[in-house]
Amino acid sequence: MNLKQVGRFGENLAVDFLIKHGYEILRTNFRCRLGEIDIIAKEDKTIVFVEVKTRKSLKFGLPSESVNFKKQLHIKKVAEYFIAYHLSQDKYLYRFDVVEIFIDGKNNVTKINLIKDAF
């Protein structure tokens, strides 16, 4: 698999994982002029913006470590756009989670880690 395929594979795994853990998936790969958010979900009355990071090795660190401050600001701006243009006037809480997907050289999942309220 190339990097794009690995990313898509990880996002699909993350969707299944989140559903099994009680999340309602609202959107996947939400795109606007400001950028993209991998998954937008709802857990109870909380809207959750999820960044998915999939890795085959730890050579470049943990997957979540690639969600640096600049990336966090970028995700927050896209989330603000989504909130402004796609949600009703209902009051929601908001949260940013990261899902780490670890796969081996044969594309077998070795671990999925959910980091709630990651930033």
UniProtKB/Swiss-Prot annotation:
GO terms for molecular function: nucleic acid binding. Pfam families: UPF0102. InterPro entries: Restrct_endonuc-II-like (IPR011335), tRNA_endonuc-like_dom_sf (IPR011856), UPF0102_YraN-like (IPR003509). Disulfide bonds: none annotated. It comes from the Bacteria. NCBIfam families: PRK12497.1-3 (NF009150), PRK12497.3-3 (NF009154), YraN family protein (TIGR00252). Belongs to the UPF0102 family. This is UPF0102 protein Athe_0977. The lineage of its organism: Bacteria, Bacillati, Bacillota, Bacillota incertae sedis, Caldicellulosiruptorales.
